[in-house]
């Protein structure tokens, strides 16, 4: 425990802003960047949820590992598994056999990544709303 729930909203706000960035990147045809930023959206949103629940900010960048630590549903866990694939490969040429990542990522991959990131954001925002209801009901 010992997290800082007051900062949870900051993490969630940044995740939301990053989602806007990912959407803009998609519209501009930057598909590798869209995929990477979507991984960041999910990571930051889940870190927000961890803080909200009173946990220390999760260290590391694996959406899958953060989701496991939060004992979150399979839908989010599966989204994390897919998004984690983009953390390195969407940015570094030495993470792919040949070519630059921006040349290799497709609109379909980026669209899928946006869907996964949106799913995580929706679930985390719902978690925040549920927490507010609990707090107002216990007063």
Can you say where each PLM-predicted feature lies in the sequence?
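Terminal alpha-helical segments
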Residues: 1-139
